[in-house]
A protein has these predicted regions:
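Juxta-kinase regulatory segment immediately upstream of eukaryotic protein kinase catalytic domains
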Residues: 1-26
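Long, compositionally biased intrinsically disordered regions
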Residues: 350-354
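Conserved ATP-binding subdomain of kinase catalytic cores across diverse folds
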Residues: 25-28, 32-42, 48-167, 247, ...
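ATP-dependent phospho-/nucleotidyl transfer catalytic cores
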Residues: 26, 30, 55, 61-65, ...
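Active-site activation/catalytic loop segments of kinase-like enzymes and analogous catalytic loops
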Residues: 248-292, 308-327
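Hydrophobic alpha-helical bundle architecture
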Residues: 113, 285-306
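Protein kinase-like catalytic core scaffold
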Residues: 51, 87, 110, 213, ...
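Catalytic activation segment of kinase domains across protein kinase-like and atypical kinase folds
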Residues: 222-263
Length: 369
């Protein structure tokens, strides 16, 4: 690590109530949003303690203090449910008692206690890994089932407001700033044909059949930590996007990413479909983790959550393609269109297996009528 950067990191860490002297610091993890460093400290008894120092990316999170207020509220609430300290992220306070430090550049920094003896997977190595990740996110819902979700800040407004995303998509089609709309008429029709579906979750929320809950909003497997030895779920991490939302969208985003048989930008669409065994595994893990806290009406909307997150993501890729690839990072011409195609194929496969998806989740309802 660059010597000047190391000195900067060490100086930042001194503003927090970490235990011991810093003996090493190095860049850590593969996250793209925040700059992250792993610190190793040696306390007065010769015990090594490790911490994770992060800079919050203010181009993504416009109100870092709201992000940190959400994280503090949720982690404080979760602590009584933890069987051991590793079961919940632990924020280290700065010397003034706050959960973040602002340096002279106006950057926001925070420190978490490192979760020892754990592994973080980008992809499940076994179906049990996928089950355990699902269980972790389900237990997150169970433990927060009585948390007043409406007290959290909406740090990214309309993040999963699919009707709003559709409005943005229609505007992109109409404006056609890059002259690409004519070449993607079939793709545009695909999303227009499903317009009546986009309000399903909000409509159910308004009816009271889909309660507002704390949603994580980034339920990829690498945001759940597993024990290194037992491979059992330890906890959920990366809480930057926690907001008021729906349990079914957390479930759905995990399915979109984890139960697909191919990468998000796979060009050969014959390789893309919904792995029903993985869907079943995740549903079982998630609902076992929820421990009966979800309403039957919520459980029956889990397939809608999976389809909604997938169709919304595909729509966002196409919107970005129409607008000139200004939001998602692309690696070659047409990359966003390729991503859009995989999501379209996944949606179509979900529709083809709809009755099966519904039957799988119905088995977990309290009322089997």
């Amino acid at each position: 690590m660059d010597r000047d950067l190391e000195l900067t990191v060490r100086d930042l860490a001194e503003h927090f109530k970490i235990k011991g002297q810093i003996i090493s610091c190095e860049p850590y993890g593969g996250g793209h949003i925040n700059s992250t460093f792993l610190l190793a400290c040696l306390d007065e008894n010769g015990k090594q303690r490790r911490y994770v120092l992060q800079r919050i990316n203010q181009s993504v999170f416009k109100s870092p203090e709201q992000v940190m207020a959400n994280i503090k509220a949720v982690t404080d609430y979760l602590k009584p449910f933890a069987e051991e300290p590793r079961n919940v992220l632990t924020l280290i306070k700065n010397q003034d008692g706050k959960t973040f430090y602002i340096n002279e550049k106006g950057e926001y920094w925070r420190i978490y206690r490192f979760i020892e003896d754990s592994i973080c997977l980008d992809l499940p190595e076994t179906t049990e890994d996928f089950y355990q990740s699902a269980y972790a996110f389900g237990k997150f819902q169970r433990d927060l089932s009585n948390f007043p979700a409406d007290t959290l800040y909406e740090t990214i407004p309309d993040f999963h407001n699919t009707p709003k995303r559709y409005e943005t998509f229609l505007k992109a089609v109409e404006e056609d700033v890059c002259g690409r709309a004519a070449s993607v008429a079939e793709e545009i029709k695909f999303f227009k044909d499903r317009k009546d579906f986009y309000s399903v979750l909000i409509d159910n929320c308004n009816k009271g059949t889909l309660p507002l809950r704390v949603s994580h909003n980034d339920t990829k497997i690498n945001n759940s930590m597993l024990d290194f030895k037992t491979r059992k779920a330890i906890c959920v991490i990366d809480l930057d996007t926690i907001m008021p939302g729906f349990s079914v969208t957390d479930f759905g985003d995990a399915i979109r990413f984890g139960a697909s048989t191919a990468a998000e930008d796979e060009k050969d669409l014959s390789k893309v479909w919904l792995d029903m065994d993985m869907f079943k595994t995740y549903a079982e893990g998630f609902l076992d983790g929820c421990g009966g806290q979800l309403l039957d009406s919520e459980i029956m909307l889990l397939p809608e959550g999976a389809k909604m997150m997938t169709v919304e993501c595909g729509m966002r890729f196409l919107t970005d393609y129409l607008q000139g690839d200004t939001y998602f990072k692309i690696h070659h011409e047409g990359h966003n269109l390729e991503r859009c195609h995989t999501q379209m194929k996944l949606v179509a496969d979900m529709e083809a297996h709809w009755d099966e998806m519904k039957a799988i989740v119905k088995k977990h309802c309290k009322n089997q009528q």
